[in-house]
Amino acid sequence: SGRSRVVQAGDLVLIDDCYNANPVSTKAALDLLSLADGRKVAVLGDMFELGEKEREMHGQVGAYAAEQGIDCLYCAGSLSEEMYRAAKEAGISQAEHFADTDALLAALPELLHPGDSVLIKASHGMGYAKIVEALEK
């Protein structure tokens, strides 16, 4: 479904919210992640259809993740590069940006640790549902 579903996947807690994303819903999802146990990992992707301020809005989300005490930010997509940059500047040392969803998916097994709480959120067109499916296996 991908609408704020919390599931236990092995030794990870997943917050599957990959159906859609805009700045307001993504900040709300980061609020939820900030309350979780363990290391707080945000796996975010591009938010589409935001208009001419889209890069700025992605940057605001990255900075907000840092404000909320998120430990790690991993993101993919061209717009999310701004999110990554802002998160690094705002103090998230464990942040990485990937060119696309497949590159991110390939790297995740090395990046995630047992006990992590992991938010997965992006616009539907980013295909993040396959990340959730892979982690649930």
Language model features: what each stretch is:
Residues 1-137:
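ATP-dependent carboxylate-amine ligase
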